[in-house]
Amino acid sequence: MTFSLVGRCARTRAYGAAITTSDLAVGSRCVGLAHGKGGVLSQHRTDPRLRDLGVRLLAEGASADAVLTEICGSTPDIEWRQVGVIDAQGRIAVH
């Protein structure tokens, strides 16, 4: 079983993420942060390309909903993935 979270400090606007699971080195595949813009987490059947897409979109100023829509539309295997996004305004989107 995997547990993950991503959040934003309202005072400093810093982002952070944590993930724990039975697989080794999963953090390097699942967590993506865009400095000052947001964060993306993926778990279960991870694909680092989806994380990278999310980070790029957040860095460009996309909303959490827009990022999640792009991620979901870019892979035929979205039903095998769990994704969470937080944007610069603290809005979240999950799949």
Language model region names:
Residues 1-95:
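N-terminal nucleophile
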